[in-house]
A protein has these predicted regions:
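C-terminal cap/linker of serine protease catalytic domains
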Residues: 1-14, 100-101, 119, 169, ...
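A short, Trp-centered hydrophobic/proline-enriched beta-strand micro-motif
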Residues: 14-35, 119
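Conserved active-site neighborhood of the chymotrypsin/trypsin-like protease fold
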Residues: 27-29, 41, 46-128, 151, ...
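Gly/Ser-enriched beta-turn/beta-hairpin loop segments
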Residues: 29-37, 81-88, 137-152, 185-187, ...
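Active-site loop architecture of trypsin-fold serine endopeptidases
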Residues: 31-34, 59, 63-65, 100, ...
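Conserved PDZ fold ligand-binding element
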Residues: 52-54, 170-174, 245-268
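PDZ-domain C-terminal substructure recognizer with occasional recognition of PDZ-binding tails
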Residues: 79, 207-214, 248-251, 257-259, ...
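A short glycine-leucine-enriched loop at secondary-structure breakpoints
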Residues: 106-110, 164-165, 238, 244-255, ...
């Protein structure tokens, strides 16, 4: 693989000091505890002189306690400034200022397939900072009612992906690490890749999230289901307790056929069809298949944030 030029390597190496490690502790009764665990670790990137850090949301969502550590060995308790459920990113801050530089925000939309980039983490191992290549930019639908249109997929995969910084050749932050995906189809072969959330999804709303803890636009309708897509079928594989889907009587194993009497053909199409109905609180008419019989179920949607443990959020 083509190496980054010496000057760019020096630039990204100096940016290492803007990376921090993040450890979060989540209560046992939090909605996400069973799925994501009660102790989570990841990375964050300092993006403003006031100490503001961006990380992947699932590391700190519902956290009762957050611990942030810089590369120089200093550490501080932290707080969640705000969550952005549309992008899946979160903003946090240390309570006690931690020294270190900031990383400028780049434009993820300028990345192209085959571009060489740098994946950087706060880990102190051989994968702390590695060269990688953009293998694809495409839609990603996550079974937890999550959809982004131009997710960034890179290879080789970094094993420390949660909150990792994706840095372009100018040394600017263009993405935040979210997933490791095995068996990804790219370049006529299957490979392991990391999926990064484009920073462009967060840049326009950073100030309003800092001021309000969230986007100012109304939240999307949320049902509280986990849905898998396989062989053209959309099957509910999990339901959060006491959430709208649970209250409506949906069950794991139900197959979703239609939204508002319109056939659904993919996971991304399912989520768009639900969100197109209006704001959170809107009733969502579903047609499902249960034990070889079609049924109609109406789910009164809600705001996702209303079901989350507030934790350290300011």
């Amino acid at each position: 693989m083509t190496r980054i030029s010496t000057s760019t390597e020096n630039l990204t190496d100096s940016a290492l000091d803007s990376l921090v490690s993040v450890k979060a502790y989540i209560p046992d009764n939090a909605m996400s505890a069973d799925l994501l665990g009660t102790e989570r670790t990841g990375h964050g990137t300092r993006i403003r002189n006031d100490g503001l850090i961006v990380t992947i949301g699932y590391v700190v969502n519902e956290a009762e306690k957050i611990w942030i550590s810089s590369r120089c060995g200093k550490a501080s308790a932290g707080v969640v400034i705000g969550n952005d459920f549309q992008s899946g990113l979160a903003l946090i801050k240390p309570i006690t200022p931690l020294p270190g530089p900031t990383m400028a925000l780049g434009k993820s939309r300028d990345l192209e397939t085959s571009d060489i980039i740098r994946v950087t983490t706060s880990a102190r191992d051989e994968q702390q900072s590695i060269d990688a290549q953009v293998v694809s930019k495409q839609e990603f639908a996550g079974r937890w009612e999550y959809l982004i249109e131009e997710a960034i997929f890179t290879a080789p995969a970094n094993k420390n992906w949660s909150g990792a910084a994706l840095i372009n050749l100018e040394g600017k932050l263009v993405g935040i690490g979210s997933l490791l995906i095995q068996g990804f189809e790219g370049n006529d072969s299957l490979c392991s890749v990391n999926m990064f959330v484009p920073i462009d999804l967060l840049t326009p709303v950073i100030d309003e999230i800092c001021d309000s803890g969230r986007r100012l636009t109304p939240e999307r309708p949320w049902l509280g289901v986990l849905v898998d897509e396989k062989d053209g079928e959309l099957t509910i594989v999990g339901i959060y307790r006491n959430c709208p889907a649970d209250e409506a009587g949906l069950r794991p194993g139900d197959k979703i056929l239609k939204v508002d009497d319109r056939p659904i053909y993919s996971l991304g199409h399912l989520f768009r069809s639900i969100w197109d109905l209006g704001e959170a609180g809107r009733k969502v008419p579903l047609t499902i298949m249960r034990r070889s019989k079609q049924q109609k179920v109406c789910v009164k949607s809600a705001e996702r944030s209303a079901f989350l443990h507030k934790g350290t959020i300011q």
